[in-house]
């Protein structure tokens, strides 16, 4: 019996369309509008700074997400993030850390909800489909969020069908533009190695930038939960989730680095500074060699698809976070098995639509959320997993060098808003 179990856990796993769907969702969560700003950032800081920061940050980000996923997948109970923490440490720890997880997720979905409404309304007016600015309409906001929430709540297979093609188009645009710039490579654009003090300062400042260019941690626990529901064997489900993460991350980094370096070799430091001052992306710089109308269309498509796929990806985590907190609180007064799951899901969906509509209607500034973003990600993706590893006996096998690495990385992410002061 034990031999059969070991054989099953060591056998080669087929890669299915379901796995491919999750790969696309993971990549879609990470790659997008921010990616096209990378060459400008590299041009500002210098290629040597970026190479050093990337050598440190990208392997470290891989370790962070891998450890994060493993800490969550070891739990015998796997309904939501709060439930997992409660299984490890009890309901009080579950609600406390669940709220922190919720804050990390809400940071992202609030930002994307603003983009969804205002960008879509702007495009509808720009392309002559409407005369009025629909972003001022309450009905438009409710309709937009109701449709997106209905799609995102329809299950991962529906998301695969809708979000998947968008991700393929996004990646296609990034790769095609990367190849289009190859004939314009000029290695004279590689700047000289900076002074040591400037170099180390800029590397320290660029590491968090690299982290956010490749992170898709928001979708990892929803993926972990989906695999656990799909597979009766916990170990098999974990293997599938880890493999999906591995394929997604390797593909993502390959695409990002190819695009970034292709443009970096094609633009000078002066052009990068000019682009930064004008707040334009690498695609705008590509207008020098690609017709302007193509740039306009692809930039629009990339922005729309980037916002939508990121919204769909982060919604899964947002819904799961709210559900976990509600069930944790209700479990203290009633038996949660008596709760109708469909009614709970519909109530959460309605709450999300109302919350996002109110948020967008008040046009609350997202600047404070940008400042809180890095510390929240540092706490949830690094500090909490480190705490769990050394607090929970079930996670003892994860202790060691990698655990201490994510602790240091988490501290750096938490301090990154302060590090901007030394720039």
UniProtKB/Swiss-Prot annotation:
GO cellular component labels: plasma membrane
InterPro entries: Amino_acid_transport_2
Keyword Lyase tagged: no
Entries under Pfam families matching the protein: Trp_Tyr_perm
Residue spans, topological domain Cytoplasmic: 1-19, 65-93, 155-161, 224-246, 315-349, 393-402
Topological region Periplasmic: 41-43, 115-133, 183-202, 268-293, 371
Family per similarity comment: Belongs to the amino acid/polyamine transporter 2 family. SdaC/TdcC subfamily.
Protein name: Inner membrane transport protein YhjV
Native species: Escherichia coli (strain K12)
């Amino acid at each position: 019996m034990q031999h059969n179990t070991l054989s099953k856990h060591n056998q080669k796993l087929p890669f299915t369309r379901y796995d491919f769907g999750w790969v696309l969702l993971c990549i879609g969560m990470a790659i997008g509008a921010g990616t096209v700003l990378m060459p400008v950032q590299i041009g500002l800081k210098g290629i040597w700074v970026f190479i050093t920061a990337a050598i440190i940050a990208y392997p470290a980000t891989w370790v962070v997400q891998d450890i994060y996923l493993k800490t969550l997948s070891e739990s015998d109970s796997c309904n939501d993030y709060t439930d997992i923490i409660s299984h490890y440490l009890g309901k009080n720890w579950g609600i406390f850390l669940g709220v922190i997880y919720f804050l990390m997720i809400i940071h992202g979905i609030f930002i994307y909800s603003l983009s969804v409404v205002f960008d879509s309304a702007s495009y509808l007016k720009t392309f002559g489909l409407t005369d009025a600015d629909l972003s001022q309409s309450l009905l438009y906001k409710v309709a937009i969020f109701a449709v997106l929430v209905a799609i995102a709540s329809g299950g991962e297979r529906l998301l695969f069908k809708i979000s998947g093609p968008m991700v393929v188009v996004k990646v296609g645009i990034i790769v095609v533009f990367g190849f289009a710039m190859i004939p314009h490579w000029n290695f004279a654009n590689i700047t000289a190695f900076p002074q040591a003090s400037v170099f180390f300062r800029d590397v320290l400042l660029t590491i968090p930038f690299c982290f956010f260019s490749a992170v898709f941690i928001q979708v990892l626990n929803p993926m972990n939960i989906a695999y656990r529901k799909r597979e009766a064997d916990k170990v098999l489900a974990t293997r599938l989730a880890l493999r999906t993460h591995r394929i997604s991350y390797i593909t993502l980094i390959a695409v990002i680095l190819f695009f970034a370096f292709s443009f970096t070799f094609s633009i000078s430091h002066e052009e990068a500074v000019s682009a930064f001052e004008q707040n334009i992306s690498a695609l705008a710089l590509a207008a020098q060699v690609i017709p302007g109308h193509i740039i306009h269309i692809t930039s629009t498509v990339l922005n729309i698809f980037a916002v939508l796929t990121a919204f769909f990806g982060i919604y899964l985590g947002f819904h799961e976070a709210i559900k976990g907190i509600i069930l944790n609180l209700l479990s203290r007064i009633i038996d949660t098995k008596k709760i109708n799951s469909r009614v709970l899901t519909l109530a959460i969906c309605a709450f999300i639509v109302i919350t996002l509509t109110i948020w967008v209607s008040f046009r609350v500034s997202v600047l404070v959320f940008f400042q809180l973003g890095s510390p929240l990600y540092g706490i949830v993706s690094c500090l909490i997993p480190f705490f769990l590893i050394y607090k929970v006996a079930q996670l003892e096998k994860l202790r060691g060098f990698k655990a201490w690495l994510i602790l240091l990385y988490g501290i750096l992410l938490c301090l990154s808003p302060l590090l901007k002061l030394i720039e």
